[in-house]
Amino acid sequence: MAKTLVFLGLLLATVMVHTAVASDPDLTTDFNVTNPVSEDFAFREFHNLQAPGKGVATPHFAQFNMKPPFVGLNGLGLAAVLFEFGPESQIDPHTHPRATEMFFVLSGEIQAGFVDTANNFFETTLYIGDIFVFPKGLLHFLRNNGKGTASGFSALSSENPGVLSVVKGLFTASGTGFPDIVISTALGINAKDSEIDGLKAAVAFKNNVTLNW
């Protein structure tokens, strides 16, 4: 556990250096905490990492500066995320338009990959203690291919990194969404409206049974 916390400290420190050139606005005060006390700058939920993955059925995350609040991070240009993956589960391909992400494996084995703007694919399998970086705005994924649970921690270089899921954006966007002809043309298929509707329904159901990502 001590080694894990050292790695996490280094991870956060690295991302904090990156935020010096990030797009989040600079503070005009030392920090953004009303009536601060010492505990505002401490976060004690890492104690729960001694038994990562316990009882997890589907991948989920807890954003440290939101649930529970880590008010000491407010305005500092950082976000922190804890992931727990059920067996053979994944975080679907998505992007963070406003942040670079550094992912650290806490338990299990995680497949990680991204594609760059030249359509080159970079992928590897990560083990406990490994770190992988997802450059800002690039499409990426995380997957637990194992039969057991896995967990990891990410630090992002913006407190509001944004999340754009390819599948959710394509099939379940709010409002009118993408026209069926646009989707079928993009996928290179001669699909009837009913087939596209079936894909949309499948994605909508999947979004209902996974958690907030």
Regions found by a protein language model. Give the residues of each.
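A generic fold-level signal
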Residues: 73-77, 97, 147
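Glycine- and acidic-residue-biased ligand/ion/polar-headgroup-sensing regions
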Residues: 86-90, 96-118, 128
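A short, N-terminal "cap"/entry segment at the start of jelly-roll beta-barrel domains
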Residues: 3-81, 189, 193-213
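Core residues of folded domains in eukaryotic genome-function proteins
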Residues: 78-81, 87, 101, 128-130, ...
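Short acidic-glycine-tyrosine-enriched beta hairpin
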Residues: 73-75, 116-137
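Short beta-strand His + acidic residue motifs that chelate non-heme Fe in jelly-roll/DSBH
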Residues: 91-94, 112-114, 124-125, 134, ...
